[in-house]
Amino acid sequence: MVQHQAFGAKTDGRDGVVMGRRGFLALTGVAAAALAGCGPSGGGPLVRLASGEVGGFYYAFAGLLAAAAARSGNVRIERVTTSGSQENLTMLANGQVDAALALSDSVGDNVDRVLALGRVYENYLQLVVRSDSTIRSVAELRGTRVNLGADGSGAALTGARILRVAGLKPEADVRVSHRPLREAMAELTAGEADALLWAGGVPTSVLEIPKRMRLVDMGELAVPMRERFGPAYDRVEIPADAYPGGAAVHTIGVANFLLAAAAMPEDVAASIVELLVYQADSLVPTEAAGTQFLDGRSLIGTAPVPLHPGAAEVYRAWHG
């Protein structure tokens, strides 16, 4: 049996919690409280997976993947709570975790230091304002107070790019802050901020759309983002029924990668990818809307990050 130390990972004290699949809202609410304190169970080597903030899609997906791993008995997955993509990549490169979720545009200089297990979900950039706000476009953020996601999150990187494409200079034209999602929502609700940017799946229940908040359409910026920063950005729609009672808007989508340390043994990588391939239905939160990438045509689309050899072997066998 391959043990955790074979990966070279170091404990950082932020142990994850493994939960069963009861949907996105349940995972971040009642079920989370009921199952809090449970650790990874079952057999197989231990993989520490850097996920994201409590209440976010990364956190929910990591919990579902850990539960699927426990059922399989071939690998154990321990979810690690983080700020998001950039912190995840740093932890993976430093050997603090064995696997990580990250936005494809956050990989950057780490492309030669990590390997991909699969392209799993589409993240939606969601610009949120209060329902009574007059802000209708990114350009109208000039002179306002905007939260661009927690330090270490993918939204912090992508958000700064969005501002630049819209003709705004971060810090100069906009008062930028970096708060975790729940803190950012509290500030927005209290009138201490004018907008927040969140990169995540839809719906994200914490955003309280349309009860108190609404989404700003950013679809017109997708092409300029691709032209300036590369092909990672897509124009996607958040349908009206994603947030019941809300309105459909277009925004920018970025693929999520499930990444592994280069030192991960091939059999361990294969065990994780088998979960993506053969237990895909159990890995999609029941309330999730929009594009999901857990299918054969999309899972292997991880360029510019090469597939882990163990992952590639599973995909070859699956496709025949």
Residue spans for each PLM region:
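N-terminal secretory signal peptides
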Residues: M1-M19, T28-A34
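Bacterial signal peptide processing site
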Residues: G39-S41
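Extracytoplasmic
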Residues: G44, N74, D112, E122-Y124, ...
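Bilobed "Venus flytrap"/periplasmic-binding protein-like clamshell domains
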Residues: G44-S72, N123-A190, D281, R297, ...
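Pocket-flanking alpha-helical
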Residues: A62, A67, E78-V114, R182-L188, ...
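Sec/Tat-exported extracytoplasmic proteins
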Residues: A69, G73, Q96, L101-S104, ...
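Pocket-lining segment of extracytoplasmic ligand-binding domains
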Residues: S104-V107, S133, P170-M264
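Segments of small-molecule ligand-sensing domains
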Residues: V249-G320
